[in-house]
Amino acid sequence: MRRWLLPEHIEDVLPAEARAMERLRRAILDLFEAHGYELVAPPLLEYVESLLSGTGRDLDLATFKLVDQLSGRMMGVRADHTPQVARIDAHLLNRQGVARLCYCGSVLHTVPAGMTKMREPIQIGAELYGHEGLEADVEVVRLMIAALKRAGIARVHIDLGNPAIYRAMAQGEPSAPERAEELFHAVQQKDASAAGALAVLTTLNGGAEVIERARRELPKLPRIAEALGQLERLARRCAAPGVEVSFDLAELGGFNYESGLTFAAFTPGSPDAIARGGRYDEVGASFGRARPATGFTMDLRQLAALAPAPPVRRAILAPALEEAALEEAVARLREAGEVVVVDLPGHEGARAELDCDRRLEKKEGKWRVT
């Protein structure tokens, strides 16, 4: 076996991609900060009791597990930031009003989450806690769109759903308790033959006409009427140039802990969603404090692959000399934001690899960029 081979769907990030990802990370986190979102950094490892609290079986299956050599307890490598950020909000911050939090870090999945996905995404996202009104959902969807635009994604298609509709219908299905997981995945995968009485949901996807069809074809239940109204209002308030909005009533969320409105963003050239989010009001309950919550997450690696290529790095090659004036000139250039690379002796034949388009040379007694 070749020792340099990596596991399937695990890849190194090389300099050009890493530079693009870092530019995006800084730009998006700056955008979040400008909207009042505070950065948090949960640990990569936690005991599974807290890491998986309040989540569904899908997240459990996606989580790598190992035994802690210090305590003997089972630990998990996070597969999603949301439960961790919910724990921070509920147990550590303990704020009474609205909390706006954001994050960026690696997660690890036992299997890829999509056709083009890696098993080690770098998640970046934002979450809003403490407000149950539609205003919170509007804010995070608009922020998600703004983040995608900041990443250079010109065309965005938003798919809206609401699992509350599925749950209201499932309660009236006699076999639902015994077939809960089977029904959930049948609807999510649009398998009408396995969805039984819920099969109608698999056909309700498309433009604004879907809401009117749903009002005609779905049971006349107050919860369903309210959920459809929320979808309609959210779509209206998130309309923007370059953004298309559609509805998918079979969209039930990512890891099966969404409790209300869900949304996913797509763009031409990517078969998988480039951002996902939704309501998850009950995740904090296992930490003793259920709070209204909504948010979204994106994969920096995926965004970097779709975003326009960043400008080619421009650098200045400086000689490796012990001279105070040279060192001062290099320091001034770096302070001004220039990249200055020292030309170490013995590597003259490999200078092209340094990607320097200018030189720092001494002319008429002064160090100048040429």
Label the predicted regions.
Residues 44-60, 161-171, 252-260, 348, ...:
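Beta-rich nucleic-acid/ligand-interaction surfaces
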Residues 41, 65, 76, 157-159, ...:
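Structured core elements
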Residues 65-77, 185, 278, 363-370:
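Short, basic, helix/turn surface patches
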Residues 151-155, 163-166, 177:
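Extended alpha-helical scaffolds
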Residues 1-83, 138:
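TRNA-binding/sensing appendages of the translation machinery
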Residues 62-70, 174-197:
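Acidic, His- and aromatic-enriched active-site or binding-groove loops in soluble protein domains
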Residues 20-35, 46-47, 82-95, 101-153, ...:
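Positively charged, Gly/Ser-enriched RNA/tRNA-binding surfaces
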